[in-house]
Amino acid sequence: MTEAFDSGAFLSTVSGRPGVYRMFDSDARLLYVGKAKSLKKRLASYFRKTGLAPKTAALVGRIAQVETTITSNETEALLLEQTLIKEWRPPYNILLRDDKSYPYVFLSDGQFPRLSIHRGAKKAKGKYFGPYPSAGAIRESLSLLQKTFFVRQCEDSYYKNRTRPCLQYQIKRCKAPCVGLVEPEVYAEDVRHSVMFLEGRSHALTNELSTAMEEAAINLEFERAAELRDQIALLRRVQDQQSMEGGTGDIDVIAAFVNPGGACVHLISVRGGRVLGSKNFFPQVGIEEEVAEVMAAFLGQYFISSPERDLPSELIVNVVHEDFPALIEAIQALRGRELSISHRVRGTRARWQQLAVTNAEQALGARLANRQHVAARFEALAEVLNLDEPPQRLECYDISHSSGEATVASCVVFGPEGAIKSDYRRYNIEGVTAGDDYAAMHQALTRRFSKLKEGEGKLPDILLVDGGKGQLSMARDVLNELAVPDLILLGVAKGATRKAGFETLYLNDAANEFTLRGDSPALHLIQQIRDEAHRFAITGHRARRGKTRRTSTLEGVAGVGPTRRRDLLKHFGGLQELSRASIEEIAKAPGISKKLAESIYANLHSE
């Protein structure tokens, strides 16, 4: 906090009413915008002597001036906050990056309408469907419609100047209205069917086509019946892929995931019970941001700062935040529509919620694995460790078990271009006291570096051990026992709060202890490798434990004898694949009823 700013004098003048506050530095640059139910209480929390998060402490240290605006209620404060964030994009706020407007499917007017992707203002005459979360999602729908109903997608200038059918006609993607090869009434029917699909009425459309197919067969119009059959097959395939069981409404499933170095919000858009697609967002965040804070900031900026975006009737999220009631009230006031938000969901909705979480986690992982991103972090690590050049190979080890059961050690390897997965290794630990992580690590390192002494594998530049002084000392003992040439040892211990960003690091021995700033790229690299070793160890442990626990699992299921057991495993390709299948997927196997599928599923997931 700058010397010029007297927080005590300032707080004595602040109102306890709802409002918005703006923090500026000594150069009058806007640092942060926030809203509060009580301005006095919220602003007082910034000037406590202890307990501030690193990012908050850094912000407070730069404050030279604070301005407030009183509002009539919390909803009004939230709306003003989002307006100011959108206009000024302060560096200490969680910021959703600018994005192009969402695309729509556009059906033009005229005797032979055209289907196309549209962004921006809706000036042209015709119908708009969407919005879709991405252009890729639209292309999937347009591709299906082109294969199914043959509505043209060419530019009007191209369409008006044709003298013979183009390639799309030859490959059965268009009926060539440009040269009069289709009657207007027939084309209009194809357009009507396309509209039904785009409006989410694909089940009604399928039923209508099924009736038409039966009539064609009765009238001995076998070619027409075959065409309708193919259309129905395409529609049912996409229904299986896109349908959301038990739902016909408009829903956005949104999951936020935060990891050292970044955050991702994944949005799945469901309209009329049909999945239109999904999209990843990567907000600008500080390292210690909580996932609920990221979610609240995203919802505000996504639905309030961009009112042109489509609003569903329900949001399904993976976290809750105290601001959600005010957020929903503000969105409803702005849009004039009802909106519900759900966190605890069951059944299919819970699976969609988990799918969004998984997608957010994987998308962020892929982003962090970007080669240039990783290379820059390697350079930062070299600077921190005073190395002449960036290391070329880092190995990290971790241990995973369940109360000593099925202990597995992992070794993951990273280079300047990212993870070297071909060099990953797992070690099934045997002959040690259950739960003795030191002995397990000793065995894993001994096996790894004994192979190195025999000429197998490469020597790492840095050996990273997930653990404190004890694990580091044990690793040093192993290297000394095997006379391994000097390499850098780095121990990573969780800090007092056990939160990411507060790790304690040990270089080569327990006496050389240090920490890095939470926003350090070098620390981000260490965290990324440590977390990958943890993930790889856990998956190996679960697989080993599961293999032990599920041996002959199917033998205990009533109604599944040797023949049916063999057929089931053949159908799914093995027990592991069968274990991943849902009840509905198991029931689709030959000779398996829904009730038997439930018994099989329950047996496989009894642990």
Curated annotation (Swiss-Prot):
One of its GO terms (cellular component) is cytoplasm. GO terms for biological process: nucleotide-excision repair; SOS response. The keyword DNA repair applies. It is found in: Cytoplasm. Residues 203-238 form the UVR domain. Residues 16-94 form the GIY-YIG domain. It holds the Pfam family UVR. PROSITE patterns: GIY_YIG, UVR, UVRC. Interacts with UvrB in an incision complex. PANTHER family: UVRABC SYSTEM PROTEIN C (PTHR30562:SF1), UVRC/OXIDOREDUCTASE (PTHR30562). This is UvrABC system protein C. It comes from Pseudomonas fluorescens (strain Pf0-1). The lineage of its organism: Bacteria, Pseudomonadati, Pseudomonadota, Gammaproteobacteria, Pseudomonadales. The gene is uvrC.
